[in-house]
Amino acid sequence: VEIVDLSNNVADRQLITPEMFSNIENEKTDLLLIKTGYGIYRGSDHYTLTPPGLSSKLAVYFREHLPKLRCVGVDLISISSYSNREEGRKAHHAFLNPDDGKSILLIEDMKLDTNGPFDKVIVAPLLIDHADGAPCTVFAYTDS
């Protein structure tokens, strides 16, 4: 589990790009949690209307630099910024339905108000037939 704190590096409506992850090269990372700091706005228009979003280029970058990555979690309502819907659609497709490579699962709207470290993370989704998404509960804990 790797946690990247971008809370001092992102602004409203900004695209989160591969350059922001140039210092992460842990080939063992299977879960990447991206903390933007926008969780403090949960329940407000600011949280839903002005958050940053993930660039579609991140999916390719993560596949190249984090070969064991299976899942990305964010403290944003969606990886798609409300103000940049087309790029958001591309990002969802790039992560979940890549033309080549494996899917990288997404967990959106996470509560990431701690910095870890975590030894184990359990993701328990509500399984719904023929759905392209579902609510899930995430448990994170440390052995120490």
How does the language model describe each region?
Residues 1-144:
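Active-/binding-site microenvironments in catalytic and ligand-binding cores
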